[in-house]
């Protein structure tokens, strides 16, 4: 049925991705050899083919493509707990590395490897009954996930124009920087994602650190803890595809409900309940509690504060046995109480869906996906750092040396600034200013604000 093809690229993407597969295997009762060992077969196996192919001998193989320009991360996945579950041919890697250089990932090293990746993608897509879309895990600060990741997305876009393209993109953090050239890599990537992706879930390490530190009370969070948060959200977004629920959603329904204008498809995500290990027993999980926490700005997995902007749209995905009526009441309640944080020219702009099966170890849980104009803070911050370096042409020789042109940087910069301006325009728009926005969104959005 409605299959999703999962692709992970670069070190960050592969680490998030392998954590995601651990979570999904756990939810569906698949052990590390790919065999089913769960307890509720009818629920866990009914729609297992969203993420798995069934191989001979009753083994379930993830529909995943793993790519990287150096073998390191792949080797550690292979030797990790779920390393044997993946199809060996689906590991595609080079030896050279992209050295945190977007141009290497997009134009030189990545371009050499891309055909091998596309062959595997085609093979997996041909095995599907009715492919729904692709989900890509990558970071935007490095070279492989950002450069080669966006190259792959644009190639897939060419070949499968009518399939959904969902990305989980880790943005550079405001205070924590891994690489000096992050602003370049991120800006060049956003330039691609605006055009070629349908939905982007925006994540960043700093916000995830804050959640681990403040909410989960972990004194020294590891990347594993951060990736666990991300994978909880990833599994939440697709849970109503994988389990029977009362109010279903799929990638396309999500997009239709969340994207009022085609370029504004960068979402904030959150998850509830997040509790520290010690305090779990003192917390009663009720729909109001979940709702309260999932709309909390401290819960957002990217460094933008939803209180600084307004929600164009949002989607709440609840999991567990609960009354749909109560869910609807709570969502309505949030909208009425905080009406100033929602744009008034899209009435009822929160979609909810309910799925019966909660995540492992919880009675109920909720995943939040919001399209808020405050996401522009992320872009604005990266853009300022980009401009500071680009004005002096710092580090540019690494990119031009791989055959890039300065013009491409200028274009990416202005595209990102246009995006910020568009978000700002709709943040300021009110329901009664009809005359001003007759400009059709189809032109590339370069009008003055």
UniProtKB/Swiss-Prot annotation:
Protein encoded by which gene: TUBB5
Tagged with keyword Nucleotide-binding: yes
A Pfam cross-reference name: Tubulin
GO cellular component entries: chloroplast stroma; cytosol; microtubule; nucleus; plant-type cell wall; plant-type vacuole; plasma membrane; tubulin complex
Designated name of the protein: Tubulin beta-5 chain
Residues annotated to bind GTP: 11, 70, 139, 143-145, 205, 227
Species per Swiss-Prot/TrEMBL record: Arabidopsis thaliana (Mouse-ear cress)
Protein family membership: Belongs to the tubulin family.
SMART domains from the UniProt entry: Tubulin, Tubulin_C
Keyword Nucleotidyltransferase: no
GO MF, any single term: GTP binding
Record PROSITE patterns: TUBULIN, TUBULIN_B_AUTOREG
């Amino acid at each position: 049925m409605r299959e999703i093809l999962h692709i992970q690229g670069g070190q960050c993407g592969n680490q998030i991705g392998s954590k995601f597969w651990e979570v999904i295997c756990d939810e569906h009762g698949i052990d590390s050899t790919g065999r089913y060992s769960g307890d509720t077969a009818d629920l866990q196996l009914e729609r297992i083919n969203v993420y798995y192919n069934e191989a001979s001998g009753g083994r379930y193989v993830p529909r995943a493509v793993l790519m990287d320009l150096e073998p390191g991360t792949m080797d550690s996945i292979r030797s990790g707990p779920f390393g044997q579950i993946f199809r060996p041919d689906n590991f595609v890697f080079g030896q050279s590395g992209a050295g945190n250089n977007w141009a290497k990932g997009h134009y030189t090293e990545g371009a050499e490897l891309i055909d091998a990746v596309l062959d595997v993608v085609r093979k997996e897509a041909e095995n599907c009954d009715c492919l729904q879309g692709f989900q890509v895990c990558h970071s935007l600060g490095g070279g492989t996930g950002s450069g080669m990741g966006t190259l792959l997305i644009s190639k897939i876009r060419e070949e499968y124009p009518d399939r959904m393209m969902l990305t989980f993109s880790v943005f550079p953090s405001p205070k924590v920087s891994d690489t000096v050239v992050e602003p370049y890599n991120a800006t060049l990537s956003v330039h691609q994602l605006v055009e070629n992706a349908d939905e982007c879930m925006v994540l960043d390490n700093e916000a995830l650190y804050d959640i681990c530190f403040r909410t989960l009370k972990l004194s020294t969070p590891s990347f594993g803890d951060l990736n666990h948060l991300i994978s909880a959200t990833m599994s939440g977004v697709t849970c109503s595809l994988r389990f029977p629920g009362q109010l279903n959603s799929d990638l396309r329904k999500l997009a239709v409900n969340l994207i009022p204008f085609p370029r504004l498809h960068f979402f904030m995500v959150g998850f509830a309940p997040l509790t520290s290990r010690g305090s779990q027993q003192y917390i009663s999980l009720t729909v109001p509690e979940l709702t309260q926490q999932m709309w909390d700005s401290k819960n957002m997995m990217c460094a933008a504060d939803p209180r600084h902007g307004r929600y164009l749209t949002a989607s709440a995905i609840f999991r567990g046995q609960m009354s749909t009526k109560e869910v609807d009441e709570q969502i309505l309640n949030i909208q009425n109480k905080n009406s100033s944080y929602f744009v008034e020219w899209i009435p009822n702009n929160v979609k909810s869906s309910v799925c019966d099966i909660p995540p492992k170890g919880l009675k109920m849980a909720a995943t939040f996906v919001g399209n808020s104009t405050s996401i522009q803070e992320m872009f604005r911050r990266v853009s300022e750092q980009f401009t500071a370096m680009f004005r002096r042409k710092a580090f540019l020789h690494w990119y031009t040396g791989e055959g890039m042109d300065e013009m491409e940087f200028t274009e990416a910069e202005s595209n990102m600034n246009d995006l910020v301006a568009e978000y700002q325009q709709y943040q300021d728009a009110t329901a009664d200013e009809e005359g001003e926005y007759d400009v059709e969104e189809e032109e590339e959005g370069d009008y003055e604000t």
